[in-house]
Design a protein with these regions (language model features):
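Conserved P-loop NTPase mechanochemical-coupling segment
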Residues: 9-18, 108, 112-160, 188-193
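P-loop NTPase motor core
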Residues: 10, 61-126
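Substrate-engagement module of ASCE P-loop NTPases
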Residues: 121, 162-173, 200-220, 542-545
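Sensor-1/coupling segment of RecA-like P-loop NTPase cores
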Residues: 181, 187, 197-238
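Amphipathic alpha-helical segments of the small helical/lid subdomains adjacent to P-loop NTPase cores
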Residues: 234-237, 245-304, 341
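Extended alpha-helical interface modules used as scaffolds for assembling large macromolecular complexes
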Residues: 242-243, 294-541, 566-573
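Domain-level recognition of nuclease-like catalytic cores that cleave nucleotide substrates
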Residues: 545, 549-573
Length: 573
């Protein structure tokens, strides 16, 4: 029987998810693991869209005083009755998600942080009337939530100490130390770096965290999440009992993302098991610690769409959820060896890289190697094994693109980059269009070889020959459309006894051009492939549609490609 529970597309509030009868993949073992391997401050680094916010919301719902304990009925953690008795609903919890902090200026972003902290503090309005708080304490609380001219009015000094002050006031009221949860701690740093106020934001975040996490005697423990582990020296200076759980750590490795068993169970629950292979190829492949996990955002979105249309094909939900500028920046900075490495990745192969897990944002683009590290930590690449470095005790990682979806991300960014490169190369494009009109096969091949020498191949080397031919067809079509805006270009146009690959109608009303594209498995076969193309044009009478338009001065080209080389043969018909 098909599950009738709603799928939680975009739902990252644990309480809402449980109260509103959404499907939930049980990750409550995370609570047990955190308590059993306790650390005063724990940072989880995972790629975006891997359930970080939902897990942090779940922690809040479990520990917070006054929680609805029935939210956890039937879940893993409810089986540990001793732990639930000791910890469930026993602590004040301060919860911040910084994922929405951004701004074109530091003042704008700083106010967003003020707003988030003040609104979180407003959840504890009972502090205003608390008998345990002194008048001075109440004044400090009121200062955190104070409003002036419709805007929250915390000054810089209070902002720095606000989380520490709030935990102190909660301790005074409840007699229990506070748990502090900060979700997506590094988003403000990312936005600051992009908008030119990185140093100011680092100073602010370091100050807030220093007061809340380092010198805070009213802290029970803290949990943070983010995509990157910003170097300890930059943000987490002086934190001694500080633990980072990254994608390379085996502990907690199944708590962010869906395991294979969880995906199989989800598909069974919705009678979707026949789609397992597609979902695995597109959304699996991430290796965290010793676990193989799927991106939960993709799985939930795709199964939800399958419920409406069982014939829908997998697509790139991850790419649509936020920007993929990091891949584009790598491509833009790539030298010839980096382009070669990207081509190996696109072809499904591995590359070997030494990885740094603790970078500052201003270091990310300082070297290509740093960019590879960030692509790994943010989920664009995943680990496929280790390689011991020669004359060293250190190991490098074998890196691979995890799945079809991320491969599509790379391909799209490469295509966008290549379009911009071609669009800015007017000289080569003009020479190409002139050579085509002049029937200069040598210059046609020369200009195409120049262009292909600059490109990053997105050709799947394992694909059948007809798919490779389609790739070169699309490449040439795109170049021709950018070479002369006055040409009318048709692709796969019915003509004679078939469909011509490319048909061009130049400004001259008497002229016409027919092109047939072929793929050659190696350079030695280019001549033969061109001859086959020319024979096909004549046999299928691909020039007929042009002649029907009154165009009688027709040039036919057979153009063959092999990797990044090509040859052109032309003939007037």
């Amino acid at each position: 029987m098909m599950n009738t529970m709603k799928l939680p597309v975009g739902i990252d509030d644990f309480r809402k998810l449980r109260e509103s009868d959404f499907y939930y993949v049980d990750k409550t073992r995370l609570i047990e693991q955190i308590l059993q391997s306790w650390s005063e401050v724990t940072l989880f680094t995972r790629p975006r869209r891997f359930g970080k916010t939902l897990n942090m919301s779940m922690l809040k719902s479990f520990f917070e005083i006054g929680t609805d304990k029935s939210l956890f009925d039937g879940l893993y953690i409810s089986g540990n009755k001793e732990l639930c008795e000791e910890y469930m609903g026993k602590y004040p919890v301060v919860f911040l998600s910084l994922k929405s902090v951004e701004g074109t200026s530091f003042d704008e972003a700083r106010y967003r942080i003020i707003e988030l902290i003040s609104r979180e503090a407003e959840r504890f309005k009972f502090l205003k009337d608390s008998e345990g708080l002194s008048e001075n304490d109440k004044n400090r609380y009121n200062a955190i939530i104070s409003v002036n001219d419709g805007k929250y009015a915390m000054d810089e000094k209070l902002l720095i100490s606000s989380l520490q002050v709030l935990s102190q006031l909660l301790f005074t009221h409840f007699g229990r130390k506070a748990i502090i949860i900060v979700d997506e701690y590094d988003v403000p740093l990312d936005k600051a770096f992009q908008n030119g106020y990185y140093n100011e934001m680092v100073s602010l975040i370091r100050g807030i965290f220093g007061m809340a996490l380092k010198t805070n005697e009213f802290l029970q423990f803290a949990v943070l999440t983010g995509c990157l582990r910003i170097s300890k020296e930059s943000i987490f200076t002086g934190l001694n009992n500080f633990r980072v759980m990254s994608i390379t750590d085996a502990r907690f490795d199944e708590q962010f993302g869906f395991t294979d068993n969880e995906v199989r169970k989800l598909l069974e629950d919705y009678n979707m098991s026949m789609h397992y292979n597609d979902i695995k190829e597109w959304y699996d492949g991430y290796h965290f610690g010793k676990a193989d996990v799927y991106c939960p955002w993709d799985v939930i979105n795709h199964v939800d769409r399958l419920c409406d249309d069982s014939d829908i094909r997998p697509q790139t939900y991850w790419i649509n959820s936020s920007g993929n500028s990091l891949v584009r920046r790598l491509i833009s900075k790539a030298d010839s060896s980096t382009k070669d490495e990207i081509e190996h990745l696109i072809a499904g192969e591995t590359i070997v890289k030494s990885i740094r897990l603790d970078l500052t944002y201003d270091e990310i683009e300082s070297t290509i190697d740093n960019m590879w590290s960030v692509l790994f930590t943010t989920g664009y690449l995943t680990k496929a094994g280790d390689v011991k470095l020669p004359d060293s005790e250190s190991y490098a990682y074998k890196l691979v693109i995890p799945n079809k979806e991320v491969r599509e991300v790379f391909i799209l960014q490469i295509q966008e980059w290549f379009k911009s490169v071609v669009a800015n190369d007017n000289d080569t494009m003009k020479l190409l269009s002139k050579a085509i009109i002049d029937k200069d096969e040598t210059k046609i091949a020369k200009q195409l070889n120049i262009v292909m020498g600059r490109m990053i191949s997105i050709l799947d080397t394992k694909a059948p020959d007809d798919m490779k031919e389609n790739f070169y067809h699309g490449l040439l079509l795109g170049l021709l459309r950018g070479s002369n805006p006055d040409w009318l270009i048709k692709s796969n146009r019915e003509s004679g006894d078939g469909f011509s690959d490319i048909m061009i109608m130049p400004e001259n009303p008497d002229a016409g051009i027919v092109i047939e594209v072929k793929y050659a498995r190696n350079i030695k076969e280019l001549d033969t492939a061109c001859e086959i193309a020319m024979a096909q044009i004549k046999e299928k009478r691909y020039d007929e549609a042009l002649r029907n338009e009154g165009r009688c001065d027709i040039i036919a080209y057979g153009i063959a490609f092999s990797r990044k080389r090509c040859k052109a043969v032309g003939e007037r018909l």
